């Protein structure tokens, strides 16, 4: 047991230092790092982003007392913040080792954050995690991860509270997703703790109050350890399982009530089905007989495929003639023939971060699209690619930029896109 405990603590400590590497598989030894010391933080950054680090340090000092008050903390140890722009990753993470790593300079930040700045939103979110870890920590003899394992705090609580205390409910966080899960009757199967965590935390606070959240997380048993399920039952009067069911009913009632006030899609116009069932983006060619799509060709596909589907009108006409002949013999009306498509894959990978996207040239000879790749110094980034339909040749148009959302001009002579160097 002593050997197992030692190995567990050592392994956990090593994992705490590999978060950024696990995202990209690269360590970036070419970077030179510096540190800014504030009253309560050590802010680490590499060359080229000092202004961003200074801004982040200021934000951190401003949000710290608010986060502590929200969680009922009187004291908080010194924390470490790491800023990097080396990879195009719209994310950040925090660890129980009291440090957070945040990727800055992100193209999709405006879509994700709405009317707030990426730095304020993501930094406040990750610092709330660190405050949370310090709120639920156990006695000295139960270090991480033993304390966390025993506490049994659900992932939705960890992520949901960070969103509840530092963010606003918005389309990408997670109104659009909730609507999809409600329509598909999969609200109870949401796997991302960020997703259901936000709405569950909003529901928890609305039903029981912010003070109850603090009481749940501050409660300790005789061994000075947090038992989340027992604490939840003690301070809310209901079991966690019942809370989850109440939340599910509440979400369904809210979103179906919202949907009942809107017109049906069929009332707006005729609905057409695309050739791919698992489709993320599409654009028709001008002749409307072809459509370019980004999606999955089969269930369980790990990446996405860029395909062009072409209608086989010859087969459709042939089948239509057969149906007409049969219908005439029986004196019936012939049934419509469903569109028949030939699908051809041209590329595969990731074609956008928040939104997969592509654009077909006005002359139908090429397609432009973003694709995730390794750039200079093996940095992860999106670049704009041009695909020739006939030649099948793929050309990288932005070798020195992080670029996304390409669109042809009406005459096809120019391309506009979002980018930074």
Label each residue range with its predicted role.
Residues 21-148, 154, 227, 352:
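Juxtacatalytic substrate-recognition/specificity segment
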Residues 270-307:
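Beta-strand-rich domains and repeat architectures in extracellular enzymes and scaffolds
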């Amino acid at each position: 047991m002593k050997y197992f405990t030692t190995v567990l603590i050592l392994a956990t400590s090593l994992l705490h230092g590999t978060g950024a590497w696990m995202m990209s598989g690269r360590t970036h030894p070419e970077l030179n790092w510096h540190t800014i010391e504030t009253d309560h933080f050590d802010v680490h950054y590499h060359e080229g982003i000092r202004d961003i680090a200074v801004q982040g340090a200021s934000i951190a000092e401003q949000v710290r007392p608010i986060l502590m008050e929200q969680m009922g903390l009187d004291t908080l140890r010194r924390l470490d913040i790491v800023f990097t722009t080396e990879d195009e990753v719209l994310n950040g993470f925090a660890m129980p080792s009291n440090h957070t790593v945040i990727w800055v300079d992100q193209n999709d930040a405006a879509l994700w954050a709405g009317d707030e700045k990426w730095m304020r939103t993501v930094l406040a979110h990750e610092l709330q995690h660190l405050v949370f870890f310090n709120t639920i920590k156990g006695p000295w003899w139960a270090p991480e991860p033993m304390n966390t394992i025993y506490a049994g705090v659900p992932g939705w609580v960890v992520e949901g509270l960070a969103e509840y205390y530092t963010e606003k409910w918005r389309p990408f966080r997670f109104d659009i997703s909730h609507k999809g899960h409600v329509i598909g009757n999969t609200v109870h199967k949401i796997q991302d703790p960020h997703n259901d965590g936000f709405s569950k935390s909003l529901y928890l606070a609305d039903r029981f109050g912010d003070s109850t959240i603090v009481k749940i997380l501050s409660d300790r048993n005789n061994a000075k350890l947090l038992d989340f399920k027992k604490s939840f039952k003690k301070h809310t009067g209901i079991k966690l399982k019942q809370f989850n069911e109440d939340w599910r009913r509440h979400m369904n009632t809210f979103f179906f009530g919202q949907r009942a006030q809107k017109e049906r899609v069929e009332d707006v116009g005729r609905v057409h089905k695309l050739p791919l069932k698992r489709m993320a983006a599409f654009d028709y060619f001008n002749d409307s007989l072809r459509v370019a799509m980004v999606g999955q060709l089969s269930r369980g596909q790990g990446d996405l495929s860029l395909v062009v589907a072409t209608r086989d009108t010859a087969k459709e006409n042939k089948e239509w003639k057969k149906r007409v002949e049969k219908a005439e013999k029986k004196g019936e009306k012939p049934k419509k023939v469903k569109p028949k498509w030939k699908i051809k894959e041209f590329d595969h990978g990731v074609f956008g971060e928040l939104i997969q996207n592509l654009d077909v040239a006005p002359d139908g000879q090429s397609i432009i699209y973003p694709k995730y790749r390794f750039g200079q110094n093996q940095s992860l980034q999106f670049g704009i690619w041009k695909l020739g339909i006939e030649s099948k040749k793929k050309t990288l148009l932005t070798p020195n930029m992080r670029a996304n959302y390409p669109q042809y001009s009406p005459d096809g002579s120019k391309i506009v896109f979002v980018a930074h160097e």
